[in-house]
Amino acid sequence: MKRTILVMALVFLFAGCLLFIQPQDGFCADPIIVGVPTSLYTPFGSYGLKAVNLAVEEINAKGGVNVGGQKRPMKVVVSDTRGGEPGVPVHDALMAYEKLLTEQKPHAIVIGAFRSEVLIAAMDLVAKYKVPQLGTIAQTPGFQAQFRKDPVKYKYLFRATTDALIDAGYIAHTLDMLKKDFGLDKILHIYQDTAWAKGFAGMLQKHCKETGWTEVGYEAYADGASDFSPALSKAKEGKAQVIGMVWDVPLGAGVFAKQYVAMKVPALLVGFIPPMGSPIAPKAVGPDVEYSMTVEFPVGATLALAKLPKTGEFLDKFKKKYGELPEPPAVNSSAYDSVFVLASAIERAGSLDPDKLVEALEKTDYAGVSGRIKFNQDHIMVFGEKSADETGVCVVFQWQKDKDGVLKRVPVYPEFLAEGKIMLPPWMKK
């Protein structure tokens, strides 16, 4: 009996080796360890991890990654940093980050920190351990500012997604359309008191002042906030026509969405509030999501675009594997793309040596779900608003009812991706 079990075990072991066999010695190839230190409390982290696992599964199904003539599988290792949970100190998140680096010894990192404050603090850790990182969540422009202080030290760090200034730029240009086409010119800003949201809201405020908007309010709330009624009341009393909102913590965003609906605030909601932009928003929030506008960064995070087939292909595969679409309208496609960018760099480097891998990553030119992926001198992905063949791109969509009365997300900006025009609610029409 024992001999039978031993023989069967050897058979299964041999079968598992066949795909990743090293031609010169006949042994199973060691896996490429891909580390994911992020906050799994947030949907950005949990759905991003699903996207990474999907990409790794696809790559391994095709034989793995060619490393200097050897086909090697990818293996994902995860550390929940809890960095996105309100009240969790940056230090605690860093300890989880470092534990993954020292114990799991990844060859590279994808996704990375959720909270921008954790990203900035973790840059020194990544540099210390010389592990190439493709960050795909944290949005603070402080990343490139820190990078410029010592490009040699921080050369292992890359941002393979947008930052707050890119996101805000798309919303700013949407506000320009609202002002030009409908004469709207009164706005109240609400933002989460965190690094990335400050950058987003600050740019939006500056743009509005420069383009003639009247500011009804500029309201900051702690990331653990659970009552937004003072700001919403201010919007009503000040007759704001638009609320520019930026938030990412699940609890607060959900509370805001419900209070906005319950208080019947007569202002158009524009910005980034995940529950309002999620594919399941009509069920989770209700029919009052109609007319709200969200920037999805980058494209392909949750919404399939008719003019960018790769977005639909990724989301179809995601839904087939997990039985649902990703929920947060941001960065899921970046997480997916990052694995392929990493695999391509490894193959071009012909090595897992971190310095050679950095050189290969710097030369990245990859056509991904999120658009064309190239990095600039600050190791951040280049974005634009004109063509996914030239740069990474985002999209602004609005919830509208189709001819059957069903709420759909309609791309309205940029023009080359638009599938409809912005619609004002009846109570705003003059």
What are these regions (language model features)?
Residues M1-I33, L101-T102, K128, W427-K430:
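Short, low-complexity disordered leader/linker segments with a strong preference
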Residues P106-Y218, L268-T294:
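Extracytoplasmic ligand/sensor domains, especially the bilobed periplasmic-binding protein
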Residues F318-N332, A343-V410:
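Segments of small-molecule ligand-sensing domains
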Residues F44-K50, V65-R148, A160, Y221-F228, ...:
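Beta-alpha junction/loop-to-helix N-cap segments that form part of ligand/metal-binding clefts
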Residues A164, A257-Y336, E347, R409-E419, ...:
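Extracellular/periplasmic periplasmic-binding protein-like sensory domains
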Residues F44, G48-A55, P89-Y97, V118-A122, ...:
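Stable alpha-helical elements in mature extracytoplasmic
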